[in-house]
């Protein structure tokens, strides 16, 4: 990636990390108290960009940082099981510009936010990879992947300087196994041309994103090759499914 593009991606990531995404949980039920405690949310709506209004049936999400306000079904679960489902549903309702800030401020949201960032970038790169212009896709895809890696880093609370950003990209965006991924794709993808390129673009982005998430969850420990192979295999399966849906729309 050129220095100009690198600086642009770095600046965008810094700006995203500076947003505010304070979350409030309202309601008088024991369920509201439990959810607020699980999320680490405040109980007052004052200054909140995300508001979860709890009721017996579920929750209603609204606020400045919410792109898709409305009802969120509340699973009949407790503790971690409730948290895992609720965070995914909240994240899917959020404005993309506030995701990094939400994860940075509220650790329970980190996994769901980083998965959403990964999938968003993978979908974009799959569409770019399907364009019939050889070589024109690489600068855009590379910039998307760099942005994804740095946004995941910011979501985990990394204070990014330009030097730190370069270091992370060298460690996480390089050598994650694109050649191995391409070899696996030949065996698993039953179609060629633009569709195969789109699958590899999607899967490569997902594999990079998932390995980056694990890197930060494990305190800076890189994923081993055996585990990376499994990540690539699953990413290819997801990529194949996504591109199959694209092909049906064309």
Predicted regions and their residues:
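Membrane-inserting effector segments that mediate pore formation, membrane fusion
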Residues: 116-210
């Amino acid at each position: 990636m050129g220095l100009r593009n690198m600086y642009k991606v770095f600046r965008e990531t810094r700006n995203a990390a500076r947003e505010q995404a304070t979350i409030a949980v309202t309601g008088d039920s024991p369920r509201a108290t439990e959810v607020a405690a699980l999320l680490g949310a405040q109980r007052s709506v004052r200054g909140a960009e995300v508001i979860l209004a709890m009721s017996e049936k579920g929750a209603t999400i609204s606020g400045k940082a919410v792109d898709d306000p409305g009802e969120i079904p509340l699973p009949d679960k407790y503790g971690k099981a409730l948290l895992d489902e609720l965070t995914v549903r909240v994240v899917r309702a959020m404005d993309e510009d506030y995701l990094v800030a939400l994860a940075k401020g509220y650790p329970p949201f980190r996994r769901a936010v980083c998965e959403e960032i990964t999938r968003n970038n993978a979908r974009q790169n799959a569409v770019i990879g399907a364009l019939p212009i050889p070589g024109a896709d690489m600068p855009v895809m590379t910039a998307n992947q760099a942005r994804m890696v740095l946004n995941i880093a910011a979501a985990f609370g990394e204070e990014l300087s330009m030097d730190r950003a370069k270091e992370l990209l060298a460690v996480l965006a390089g050598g994650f196994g694109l050649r191995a991924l391409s070899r696996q794709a030949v065996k698993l993808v039953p179609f060629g041309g633009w569709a195969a390129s789109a699958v590899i673009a999607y899967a490569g982005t997902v594999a990079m994103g998932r390995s980056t998430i694990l890197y930060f969850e494990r305190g800076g420990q890189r994923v081993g090759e055996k585990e990376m192979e499994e990540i690539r295999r699953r990413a290819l399966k997801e990529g194949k499914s996504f591109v199959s849906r694209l092909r049906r729309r064309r």
